[in-house]
Amino acid sequence: MLHQKPDIFCKIELGLPLSKVQDLLAEIDANYGEIIKYKIDTDGQRKRNKPKYVEKLGEFCTRVINPPNDRLKQIQKRINKYLNAKIPLPKYAFGAVKNKDNVKNAREHKGQKYVFQTDIRDFFPSISYKRVYAALTSAGFSPDVASLITRLTTYKGHLPQGAPTSTFLANLVFSTTDRKSVV
């Protein structure tokens, strides 16, 4: 499933795989010493967990946000920009995709007999380190590079809500699932 290499991840077209960590660092304009400091998944990388109150269906619930510290956030923004430039998401992906929004998504479904909509509880925390790593290797990254990206973008073994890279990586992880759902 995740190990399939869909056409959208054509390695030759993307200039992948990046086989060396140094290649990734050059692409995101960082040096190894800087990255190595942020590579290990520790509590020290994150600001204090912030509960965020959101209204959903007339009720208030909380979401725990785990934003990275300022330096890690800069690195993640560079990684996010790099991933967005290298890996095209499927045309049906709308969640936090540039130039797409709920209105455009609704237009795509106008006139359809059935539309399935769901909200996954604890969505980002439900996406594990292993699934992020598998999606990146499936997209053509070498194990070393996929491991580094995964370690820099996950927190306590999952995607954190509040990181610049989480939405793109969630879209990447679920692109195979989404593709199977599209009729």
Predicted feature descriptions by range:
Residues 1-53:
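Non-catalytic, polymerase-adjacent accessory regions of viral genome-replication enzymes
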Residues 5, 16-19, 30, 67-78, ...:
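Generic alpha-helix structural propensity
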Residues 17, 82-83, 87, 132-135:
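N-terminal low-complexity, intrinsically disordered segments
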Residues 34, 61, 112-116:
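A generic secondary-structure signal marking the coil-to-beta-strand transition
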Residues 37-76, 93-95, 151-171:
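Short, conserved non-catalytic motifs in the polymerase core
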Residues 71-122, 167:
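Active-site-proximal segment of RNA-dependent polymerases
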Residues 108-183:
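Conserved polymerase palm-domain catalytic core
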